[in-house]
């Protein structure tokens, strides 16, 4: 789709009548378990950043791991950034990803349950099983909205914000969320579920406009859905009904915090039209940066600088 058409494009993604009720019940069920935040200092050898191994209770009270990185010796209260990672990745090593702590933020990087063996390592299992699924997580538990994998992930992600806000070093009124690709999609879900974030940044976000994405790109991970439906031909309608409860377009409609989006015109993994579908639907103040000559890497470090500027404005 040409860039000029993207500005006119609107997603046709519909939302279930009980979308809000489903997510309210999901979060009520999740919050029935104590948050149980545990923080343990990690000896990394770093001199400018203090790192902590954090565990909190996510979906069903199941433990979720995260790294907390803060400027060395900081006592706060600091503005905080909760970060979600891309598909197949985990929280990585404690000495990685130092940008946000270097900018004076408390930085909580959430592990993604059941991932963390594709390009960075993770430490959080997904104890819940599922029925038949295509390799990967896109169709795990897709038989119903209750069992779908991303129900658990999005519940974890909301609890990550709550865990960050519980920390003495964090100013709970100045918590922003950020992520790229899958992490960007998770950030948009949190933006729709947590009404009082300071700001949101979604770089080349995944998990947006599933129905469109699943038919316009041959690239994984969206293609996992296509391969599943190539085998389960009769299930297209029910699968897309389930996915509508997890679509970034529907979460974006409920977002209210200032948001920064980015997209890349040569991105085959998260096609620009799917990103624009979420961008145009977003309910709060918003801006989008287009990288005309990039693929799924988007703006790389430039995306971080865009987010930093937005977060500082929101936390001033």
Where do the language-model regions lie?
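N-terminal targeting or regulatory segments adjacent to alpha/beta-hydrolase or S9 domains
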Residues: 1-50, 103
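Cap/lid segment of the alpha/beta-hydrolase catalytic domain
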Residues: 92, 98-99, 105-155
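Hydrolase active-site cap/lid region
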Residues: 188-234, 290
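Short beta-strand element of the alpha/beta-hydrolase
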Residues: 66-70, 76-88, 107
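Acidic catalytic loop of the alpha/beta-hydrolase fold
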Residues: 265-270, 297
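Gly/Ser-rich "nucleophile elbow"/oxyanion-hole loop immediately N-terminal to the catalytic nucleophile
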Residues: 136-180
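Histidine-bearing beta->alpha loop at or near hydrolase active sites
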Residues: 285-305
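Short beta-strand/loop motif that positions the catalytic acidic residue
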Residues: 255, 261-263, 267
């Amino acid at each position: 789709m040409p860039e000029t058409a993207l500005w006119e494009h609107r997603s046709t993604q519909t939302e279930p009548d009980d979308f809000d009720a489903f997510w309210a019940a999901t979060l009520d069920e999740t919050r029935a378990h104590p948050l149980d935040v545990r923080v343990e200092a990690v000896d990394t050898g770093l001199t400018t950043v203090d790192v902590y191994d954090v565990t909190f209770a996510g979906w069903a009270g199941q433990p979720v791991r995260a790294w907390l990185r803060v400027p060395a010796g900081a006592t706060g209260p600091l503005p905080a950034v909760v970060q979600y990672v891309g598909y197949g990745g985990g929280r990585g090593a404690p000495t990685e990803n130092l940008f946000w702590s270097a900018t004076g933020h408390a930085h909580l990087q959430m592990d993604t349950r059941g991932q963390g063996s594709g390009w960075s390592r993770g430490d959080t299992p997904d104890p819940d099983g599922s029925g038949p699924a295509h390799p990967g997580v896109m169709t795990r538990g897709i038989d119903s909205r209750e069992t779908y994998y991303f129900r658990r992930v999005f519940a974890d992600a909301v609890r990550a914000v709550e865990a960050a806000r519980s920390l003495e070093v964090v100013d709970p009124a100045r918590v922003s969320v950020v992520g790229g690709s899958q992490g960007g999609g998770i950030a948009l879900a949190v933006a729709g579920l947590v009404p009082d974030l300071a700001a949101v940044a979604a770089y080349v976000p995944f998990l947006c406009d599933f129905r469109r994405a699943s038919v316009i790109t041959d690239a994984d991970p969206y293609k996992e859905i296509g391969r599943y439906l190539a085998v389960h031909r009769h299930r297209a309608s029910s699968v897309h009904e389930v996915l509508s409860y997890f679509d970034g377009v529907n979460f974006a409609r409920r977002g209210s915090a200032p948001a920064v989006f980015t997209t890349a015109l040569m991105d085959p993994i998260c096609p620009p039209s799917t990103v624009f579908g979420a961008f145009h639907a977003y309910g709060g103040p918003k801006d989008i940066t287009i990288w005309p000559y990039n693929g799924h890497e988007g703006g790389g470090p430039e995306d971080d600088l865009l987010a930093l500027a937005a977060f500082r404005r929101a936390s001033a």
